[in-house]
């Protein structure tokens, strides 16, 4: 679990390797990640956009920009939480994701909050040798 707090908004990310959607022999790996955004502050905020930076083990970087998350632009009152799960494919067995969300406060102010960097790693495969 990876966590960052910006301006009383907590973002927690938990990645998980999805073996059933991966084909390691063909260099295709897939991870699901669950993100929870929690409003720990006193103002109502709305998540308006996202910016992800995804880097594989070869240093290839892809940037993803978009409105909201998973088709929604959730509003979080004080104490409110929003959780979603999405996925990312890579051509390498490791990588890293990071980024930020664009938020809108009740007073019309826009600001960015950090999405913590998190690693994408194929779980260790233990081999037993006799």
UniProtKB/Swiss-Prot annotation:
GO biological process: error-free translesion synthesis
SUPFAM superfamilies on file: ApaG-like (SSF110069)
One Pfam family this sequence matches: DUF525
Domain ApaG as annotated: residue spans: 3-127
Official protein name in the record: Protein ApaG
Organism of derivation: Xanthobacter autotrophicus (strain ATCC BAA-1158 / Py2)
């Amino acid at each position: 679990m990876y966590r960052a707090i910006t301006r009383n908004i907590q973002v927690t990310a938990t990645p998980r390797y999805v073996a059933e959607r991966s084909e390691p022999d063909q260099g295709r790996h897939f991870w699901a990640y669950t993100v929870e955004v929690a409003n720990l502050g006193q103002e109502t905020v709305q998540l308006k956009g996202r910016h992800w930076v995804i880097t594989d083990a070869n240093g290839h970087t892809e940037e993803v920009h978009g409105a909201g998350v998973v088709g929604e632009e959730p509003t979080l009152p004080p104490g409110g939480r929003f959780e979603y799960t999405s996925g990312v494919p890579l051509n390498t067995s490791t990588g890293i994701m990071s980024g930020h969300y664009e938020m809108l406060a009740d007073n019309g102010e826009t600001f960015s909050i950090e999405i913590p960097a998190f690693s994408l790693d194929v779980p260790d495969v233990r081999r037993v040798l006799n």
